[in-house]
Amino acid sequence: MPKLSLAKLERHLYSAADRLRQEGLDAATYKDYIFGMLFLKRCSDVFDAEREKIVGAKVEQGMVKEKAETEYGENPDFYDGFFVPERARWIYLQDKLGDAREPYGSVLDKALGALAEHNDTLEHVLDHISFMRVQSNKRIVSDDACKDLVRHFSRYRLRNEDFQFSDLLGSAYEFLIKMFAESAGKKGGDIYTPRDVIRLMVRILKPMPGQSVNDPTCGSGGMLIISREFVEQSGGDPTNLRLCGQVNDASAWAICKLNMLLHGVPGADVRLEDTLLHPMHREAGELERFDRVIANPPFSQNYTKSNMEFPERFRWGWAPTTGKKGDLMFAQHMLAVCKPGGMVTTVMPHGVLFRGGAEKEIRKKFLEQDLIEAIIGLPPNLFYGAGIPACILVMRPNLTGQLPNPNKPENRRGQILFINADAEFHAGRAQNYLRPEHVEKIVSTYDRFEDIPNYARRVALAEISSPANDSNLNIRRYVDNSPPPEPHDVRAHLLGGVPVAEVEAQRSLFEALGFDATHAFAARSDAPSPPETGERDGVRGNAYFDFAPSLTDPSAIRPLVENDPGVQARVQALRDALAGWWSAHASRLADLPQHRKLNRVRSEFLDSFSGALSPLVVLDRFKLAGVIATWWTDTLPDFKTLLENGFPGVIDGWVDAIADAVDDDEAAGPTFDPFAHKLVRRVMSDYLDQIAAAKTDVARLKGEKEAFEQSNEPDDADEEELKIWNYAKDLERQIRELKAENKDALKELAKAEKVAAGNPSSKRKPHPLAGGGKGEGGMPAIRQSILAARARPNCSARSFACALREN
């Protein structure tokens, strides 16, 4: 049985959500039903596997199967995971699909209730899910929809051995949470922090095995999950990391608990209560302290002191209880529950950096005790439902009050690193995103604790506290990344020409690409010579250029650059350097299944790639690091598969992904083009070229067909014209038939590639559709027909159609 890939499972879940959208439900409503159904199916499938193992062991020992099933298979004491009672098992739910004696929604509710009743870990976790809920005298989810969901989730088994990598189900659950957050707007922001922001924060904290991580406003639990993921990918034991969270919303708490369970972290300690009023993690009556504290608290909220426990947490001051200025109260709580030598990272709105009043006094005390290590300005509109600018505070506690803060690394004491990253992001349709290259630059700058012009600067506390700055932490005050004004040459605007000064300003870019700018410009003969101009680029006394005579159209610029000898030489040097780097370091991937230290290999790739290509000065070190960071993120599911199934498992996954994309009817969700897959490009390049050429011909034929139809009416057409009326559609039909044949070709060729990968001496016979074959009716035949017809002199749409039919 092919293993489930993350992309396939995501499409499967997306289709399930589509079915509930047909009921008129929004994301805030239907998410609970998808979560509940997914959890039921997962628990049942895992239980079945464990039950088979328990019963099978007893049968091997000589026990009658029926007795083994009764005495051991139905005994909760023999199960390490969840015990699933009969009415919560998937086979029972399937059997009930045709039973009309009871509403099917009630069957599902009883299944959830029975599952929770038999497993203490699930106490109150599933209470909010009810398939019988009524709104405005109508069931929210109809019985038909409930049954469709069960049939839909019956398509795939969800045991660990069915997944390409063990954490696949947890990753799919994260996909669901993100999908719901995107649809829910501001409400989505309450439970979901973009994972690129979380990974940035976790990479700054660098949690290690044996430590404890706390998120006092944990939402769906993403910060805890990714902290665990970081430890695992660093080669550490993730089970030796204590995860604790607290959230003040019952629905978010349930989502978080399910997230932990589906990621295989049943021991995560997640509490339901208001963190500022009643912090729940305690030891011997005192607040528990943690090695790493990470959070994205709700922005700009009021709070109350009424019945507040442990008020000594706020020894740096009290923010106003009204006016939506409770942000620094969360920051103080995080410092109060952080161990000596620990670290804090928290997202904050920019207002906490510069507002006056009580917040300013808290800020002053933070500075006086040297608590802040770095302030990172983030791009706007990163967070769901919050368009206001945000930043990340990196802090270390100072319980002794000694100055400078002894918990900071020695070279960071008495100063703050300001990083202004608000201009570097990917602009999406509804919100902005941090790409891996942006995260890599921020983390690298923080780790090096270095100054970078217009991006980062270390500032002494004395400068910040001076009368001129008055404890104002506004990032732009210390790192202004405003772009320089665009130069405007009035004379060039009026009389034409390209100022030589503007060309000179881009000289470093031209040189990096190996391009000689004089090939694109020529001396402007009608321009007077300013006295100060002198000789520049062989054009004496001329302050303006014209474009070269060969550049008569903007479309000519690209070929001029691409065909420039210097550019071609630089491109070849880049290719050679890349090939040399890959040849020297690709073998590191082969060692991954042994040591499992993904982060170490990633770091080695980043450093070695930059070292190999930076001498070419085409890209700076941050751009080079971004290339590897982006590639690594895109390839991470394959790396996870490699760790657990080796290279054959990776190639199996590629084959299955290609086949799924061709065959899968769940196409509404996240998809990819199978013809763009790396494996298809490698083994079927000729065929892909022919497909592209045929598509070009189809587009041209459509245009000719439309012109033909506009000048000829069907009623007036003779028999000959009627025969060729739909010639373009005939060709499109042939293309569709070819693609249908290609389903098998994709699978056969990919499997042949897998065999060849395992046996270098194997000989592959090319598939007829891949070019060079003798199959009939394939792309070569169509392509030859097109070429033969188009080669005829005076080929009109009508004569071309006739010729095509003859061929």
Residue ranges and their predicted role:
Residues M1-L205, P209, R271-M280, G377-P380, ...:
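Non-catalytic, mostly N-terminal accessory regions of nucleic-acid modification and defense proteins
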Residues K187-A295, S300-E309, F314-W318, L328-M329, ...:
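Conserved S-adenosyl-L-methionine
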Residues F290-D291, N398-H488:
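Polynucleotide-recognition surfaces of large bacterial nucleic-acid defense/processing enzymes
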Residues C338-V344:
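Short glycine-dipeptide loop
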Residues F354-R355, L382-A386:
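Short glycine/serine/proline-enriched coil/turn segments at secondary-structure junctions
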Residues I388-I392, R476:
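Short hydrophobic/aromatic beta-strand or adjacent loop that forms the aromatic wall/cage
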Residues S529, T533, K765-P766:
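Low-complexity, intrinsically disordered segments with a bias for serine/threonine
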Residues G534-R536, G771-E776:
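Glycine-biased, low-complexity coil/linker segments
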